[in-house]
């Protein structure tokens, strides 16, 4: 049975993506793993918290998802992986929730996630990587 690896990608942070490439490639070679890439678009309440109204200021969610998928596909080209083993997912909502949901659904044997170095804000507020580590039902590799 092939392993399944979930790789959440923040399309707005290329430095984080660079950090996981070698780890994903190495893990994917084991048992010819299937690799699922995921990016998450914040939901509309997030945009409202930035002071944007629910109006023409906000692009349609379908447009946001299409653009995110296009960007994710460009990022995936940096990984040396067989294309028939790569899957692309774009979701809306809380990153940690969508990561955990997809990990259960596919089901993932491992999640490889990049994380910023911890600072006071991550200790006070928590981070997506920390939440994934705490709640995932599979192994999680956090790359810093």
From Swiss-Prot:
InterPro entries for the chain: Rossmann-like_a/b/a_fold, Universal_stress_UspA, UspA
One of the Pfam families matching this protein, by short name: Usp
The organism's place on the tree of life at top rank: Bacteria
PANTHER family for the chain: STRESS RESPONSE PROTEIN NHAX, UNIVERSAL STRESS PROTEIN F
Subunit structure: Homodimer.
Assigned protein family: Belongs to the universal stress protein A family.
Protein name per its UniProtKB record: Universal stress protein F
Organism in which the protein naturally occurs: Escherichia coli O6:H1 (strain CFT073 / ATCC 700928 / UPEC)
Gene: uspF
């Amino acid at each position: 049975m092939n392993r399944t690896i979930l790789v959440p990608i923040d399309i707005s942070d290329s430095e984080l993506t660079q950090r996981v490439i070698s780890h994903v490639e190495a893990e994917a070679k084991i048992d010819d793993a299937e690799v699922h890439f995921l990016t998450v678009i914040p939901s509309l309440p997030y945009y409202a918290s930035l002071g944007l109204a629910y109006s023409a200021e906000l692009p349609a969610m379908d447009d946001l998802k299409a653009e995110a998928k296009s960007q994710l596909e460009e990022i995936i080209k940096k990984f040396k992986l067989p294309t028939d083993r790569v899957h692309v997912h774009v979701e809306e909502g809380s990153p940690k929730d969508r990561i955990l949901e997809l990990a259960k659904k596919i089901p993932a044997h491992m999640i490889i996630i990049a994380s910023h170095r911890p600072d006071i804000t991550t200790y006070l507020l928590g981070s997506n990587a920390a939440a994934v580590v705490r709640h995932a039902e599979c192994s999680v590799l956090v790359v810093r």
